Amino acid sequence: MEGAEGNAGQPGPAERSHRSSVSSVGARAADVLVYLADDTVVPLAVENLSSISAHELHRAVREVLQLPDVALEAFALWLVSPLLEVQLKPKHQPYKLGRQWPELLLRFTNASDDDVAMDEPSLQFRRNVFFPRRRELQIHDEEVLRLLYEEAKGNVLTARYPCDLEDCEVLGGLVCRVQLGPYQPGQPAACTLREKLDSFLPAHLCKRGHGLFAAFRGRGAKTGPGEQGLLNAYRQVKEVTGNNSEREATLGSHYRAYLLKCHELPFYGCAFFHGEVDKPAQGFLHRGGRKPVTVAISLEGVHVIDNREKHVLLGLRFQELSWDHTSPEEEEPVLWLEFDGDSEGTPVNKLLRIYSKQAELMSGLIEYCIELSQAAEPTLSQESASGPHEAPSPSPPPTQRPKLRRQGSVVCSRIQHLSTIDYVEDGKGIKRVKPKRTTSFFSRQLSSSQGSYTVVQPTDDSLEQS
């Protein structure tokens, strides 16, 4: 996609609806509908729809919502459909991109001709992938915090952000506080939570068991594990103390608390892409196959998420990987991720291939995020050298869970569930054949920081040559 930011992926279930952002077109003016994260609509009457830029529409949305200047960097306009998501650059013309949508679908998705013909994007006002988390912590405007909160909540509830149960309960408790008000002892909170459980917890955590025991449990008033944890988290939500007891000010602190908790997730604020990876060979016939994954890319790194199991398969900072993409004729495009690992105690380089028609977009986004990170390093160094500054709202460090609990966390890598190509520099393969690689492959890495990816030298003559 020429000039695009390159953010594409599969939207969550809440976004899987066909809706147009152009409600009526006249000779000169048109009503453009811009959707917010909570599915509310901002109607805009614009002149010269075919030539208006994303920057101009972005400014119009900010004026209608009366957002401060920070919203210019915190949010971006997106074209979103059930098949593809694209973050727009300020210079892009949304109407023209909308007209080109079928071409983009054919280029970057595996959608059928019928699906392409039926698909229609909507214009959405969402978080900018390139907005740093540290800047987000400095925001105090109530409406900006609310919009960020609504988007993060949607990603948690649709499991685009995989979370451990205890984290989901904490986040769900904050949602309860926002939607139901302060917890009041004695109120029928358990019944209310049970009726709206999917409004507070991801759907896969709301499924009840089946069978005889589930039937008996349903007759009583006892809550399930998720419900009880959610209720406890709701009780423990801290209220803001002070003279200002206005509801908006109180909610602002809970929006911020929700976002701070989400900042613990390594893939918060990512762009999402669709792909597939090879499964490890299993069984007598060593059959593998593929599994669908979501590739999440942010300013910090890359995460590969199992769509079915809702957990991370691989998480890498940019300092820990090298990458490339290939698009050979008559073959599937592939994003290659190369990183350090070991094979039965032997240090090796591991190579993961992600099959995706969006490989080109992912590779471009990785390269751009690295450029932004390198450009930001001098600025951060100058800020550190200028002396300590008082933070406007310092947050307490997150409490670390016991080590054994963390090992099973959904955000921990599960490399054993991936089929990788293991090798050393001179091409000696470990159990698999080293594929042909482009000459620029090792050069595409962030090697200026400590702990960077390194090429493993062959040290053991017993390595199997495939």
UniProtKB/Swiss-Prot annotation:
Signal peptide extent: none
Keywords (A to Z) from UniProt: Acetylation, Cell membrane, Cytoplasm, Membrane, Phosphoprotein
Modified residue annotations for N-acetylmethionine: M1
Tissue: Widely expressed (at protein level).
Gene null: resulting phenotype: Mutant mice are viable and fertile.
Segments forming domain FERM: 30-377
Modified residues (Phosphoserine): S24, S384, S409, S440, S447
Bias (Polar residues) ranges: 442-460
Bias kind Pro residues: ranges: 391-400
InterPro entries documented for this protein: Band_41_domain, FERM/acyl-CoA-bd_prot_sf, FERM_2, FERM_central, FERM_domain, KRIT1/FRMD8, PH-like_dom_sf
Compartmental location: Cytoplasm, Cytosol; Cell membrane
GO BP annotation list: positive regulation of tumor necrosis factor production; protein localization to plasma membrane
Recorded GO CC terms: centriolar satellite; cytoplasm; cytosol; nucleoplasm; nucleus; plasma membrane
Protein function: Promotes the cell surface stability of iRhom1/RHBDF1 and iRhom2/RHBDF2 and prevents their degradation via the endolysosomal pathway. By acting on iRhoms, involved in ADAM17-mediated shedding of TNF, amphiregulin/AREG, HBEGF and TGFA from the cell surface. Negatively regulates Wnt signaling, possibly by antagonizing the recruitment of AXIN1 to LRP6.
Subunit details: Interacts with iRhom proteins, including iRhom2/RHBDF2 (via cytoplasmic N-termini); this interaction leads to mutual protein stabilization. Interacts with LRP6; this interaction affects LRP6-binding to AXIN1.
Protein name, per record: FERM domain-containing protein 8
Lineage: Eukaryota, Metazoa, Chordata, Craniata, Vertebrata
